[in-house]
């Protein structure tokens, strides 16, 4: 009896060439249904329809096609088992040797936020997962293929005889395939039915194993959804990305997106902006008239810290910008695009990692912010709500000037991307000093003001949390700061406001805290 291959795929890439090889080179009988059968028949291949094989017509508009003992019995039968052999003979069920199945495109369907409940439900595959799981369970006797990129490897192995190791690997990939499918369904339903699902599930495929983690003695791997977020990034040149590179790139991108991200249409940047990050904290941020101008100002904000940093730009990188990027040692640059001349210039820095990340990939990423704790995960929304200056209140006697208002808005956009306790000193669309990660707020203020130096005079100061005492505002006033922005909400707000009035500072309360841990 000729071996049988059952083929039923949603993704039909490569299916004809696979079927041709199975039939013409290895003598397989082809068993198929629905659209896959038609594709194979149109290619001139002899196909036995599943309905003909089972003697049962497809019913319920195609919802029931392969759920039949002559299909599942043929897949699950253990060769050489006397009882199974008797059952196969008694019920005239031929064994099925290869199962090639991938599933209805549920994840792709629900990627459209406007998809209806009914459309999503119709894209939940039933027969496909049942066949995949059956074949994976019986992998000692059946090979199961769930992705087109497995076809060539399998055909090469088939010529020499498929060994047990390959069957086990294919079975693992099959169970990963169905598990990810079920997770996608339950996650989508959970989000649609409740803000907080009873289980948090997400299946994210491995993108690459990293050389090491944050330190050389730590193992690490990068898991990423294809075409979503960093999974949609294209590395144009440079060394392999590291764990620390990715963490810093994430921080840099989040910061630069405060000013828009993209080059045209719906993704046009609101202001040309550049961000330099070290150890996940922005050390230089600026806006400018053009990306090159913004980059120059961001680097000038703290050239010492910028050495070995990560840069994010929110617009197209041209030749002028590229020359600025080559002026000092950098680890990575991410932008929505690079002009050909810029690529040529940057090629002189062979180790510099260039990443092109399209705005569409950024938009496709989910809004969950996930961190692990011992034995679990914490899931929260991203802190990315639009900043609305019209909701702010002036607490001091003096209101900020129009110029100070612009600076306060800029500093407030930046401070929520600095590790708490966070203080930012800024002026004219440029960070002048950043105080990050100190255990008390006045300590962060000292760092930011020291970094700003004489430029602090006439600048503004932003704080991610309220002032528990008036010491930070008093320190700011002594350094010449002219306006302060903070959430408010301290029992001693009046003390800090009084210091502002004493020194003629303007104070704005946002009513919203932005801790970052």
Swiss-Prot record:
InterPro entries: AICAR_Tfase_dup_dom_sf (IPR024051), Cytidine_deaminase-like (IPR016193), MGS-like_dom (IPR011607), MGS-like_dom_sf (IPR036914), PurH-like (IPR002695). CDD domains: IMPCH. It comes from Prochlorococcus marinus (strain MIT 9303). This is Bifunctional purine biosynthesis protein PurH. NCBIfam families: PRK00881.1 (NF002049), purH (TIGR00355). Residues 1-146 form the MGS-like domain. Belongs to the PurH family. GO terms for cellular component: cytosol. It catalyses: (6R)-10-formyltetrahydrofolate + 5-amino-1-(5-phospho-beta-D-ribosyl)imidazole-4-carboxamide = 5-formamido-1-(5-phospho-D-ribosyl)imidazole-4-carboxamide + (6S)-5,6,7,8-tetrahydrofolate; IMP + H2O = 5-formamido-1-(5-phospho-D-ribosyl)imidazole-4-carboxamide. SMART domains: AICARFT_IMPCHas, MGS. The gene is purH.
């Amino acid at each position: 009896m000729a071996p049988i291959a059952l083929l039923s795929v949603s993704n039909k890439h490569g299916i004809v060439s696979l079927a041709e090889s199975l039939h013409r080179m290895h003598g397989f009988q082809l068993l198929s249904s629905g659209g896959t059968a038609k594709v194979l028949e149109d290619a001139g291949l002899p196909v036995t329809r599943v309905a003909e094989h089972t003697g049962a017509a497809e019913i319920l508009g195609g919802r029931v096609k392969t759920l039949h003992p002559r299909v599942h019995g043929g897949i699950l039968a253990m060769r050489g088992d006397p009882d199974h052999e008797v059952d196969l003979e008694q019920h005239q069920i031929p064994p099925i040797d290869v199962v090639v199945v991938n599933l209805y495109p549920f994840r792709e369907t629900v990627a459209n936020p406007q998809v209806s409940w009914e459309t999503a439900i119709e894209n939940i595959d039933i027969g496909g997962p049942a066949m995949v799981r059956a074949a994976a369970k019986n992998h000692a006797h059946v090979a199961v293929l769930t992705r087109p990129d497995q076809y060539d490897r399998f055909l090469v192995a088939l010529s020499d005889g498929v060994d047990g190791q390959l069957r086990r690997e294919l079975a693992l990939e099959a169970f990963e395939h169905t598990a990810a499918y079920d997770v996608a369904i339950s996650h989508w339903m959970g989000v649609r039915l409740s803000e907080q699902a009873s289980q948090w599930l997400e299946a994210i495929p491995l993108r690459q194993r990293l050389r090491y983690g944050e330190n050389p003695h730590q193992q690490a791997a990068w898991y990423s959804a294809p075409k979503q977020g960093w999974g949609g990034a294209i590395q144009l040149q440079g060394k392999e990305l590291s764990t620390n590179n990715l963490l810093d790139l994430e921080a840099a991108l989040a910061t630069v997106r405060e000013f828009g991200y993209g080059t045209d249409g719906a993704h046009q940047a609101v202001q040309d902006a550049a961000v330099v990050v070290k150890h996940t904290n922005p050390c230089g941020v600026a806006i400018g008239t053009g990306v090159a101008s913004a980059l120059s100002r961001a680097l000038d904000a703290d050239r010492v810290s910028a050495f070995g940093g990560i840069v994010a730009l929110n617009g197209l990188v041209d030749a002028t910008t590229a020359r600025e990027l080559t002026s000092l040692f950098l680890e990575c640059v991410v932008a929505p695009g690079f002009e050909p001349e810029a690529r040529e210039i940057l090629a002189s820095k062979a180790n510099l990692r260039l990443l092109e990340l399209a705005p569409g990939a950024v938009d496709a990423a989910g809004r969950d912010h996930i961190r692990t704790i011992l034995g679990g995960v914490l899931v929260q929304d991203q802190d990315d709500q639009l900043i609305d200056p019209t909701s702010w209140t002036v607490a001091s006697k003096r209101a900020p000037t129009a110029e100070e208002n612009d600076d306060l808005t800029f500093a407030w956009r930046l401070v929520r991307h600095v590790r708490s306790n966070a203080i930012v000193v800024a002026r004219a669309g440029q960070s002048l000093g950043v105080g990050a990660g100190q255990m008390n707020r006045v300590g962060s203020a000292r760092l930011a003001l020291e970094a700003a130096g004489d430029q602090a005079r006439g600048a503004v100061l932003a704080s991610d949390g309220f002032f528990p005492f008036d010491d930070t505002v008093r320190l700011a006033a002594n350094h010449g700061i002219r306006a302060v922005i903070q959430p408010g909400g301290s029992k001693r707000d009046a003390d800090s406001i009084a210091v502002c009035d004493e020194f003629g500072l303007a104070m704005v309360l946002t009513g919203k805290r932005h801790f970052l841990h």
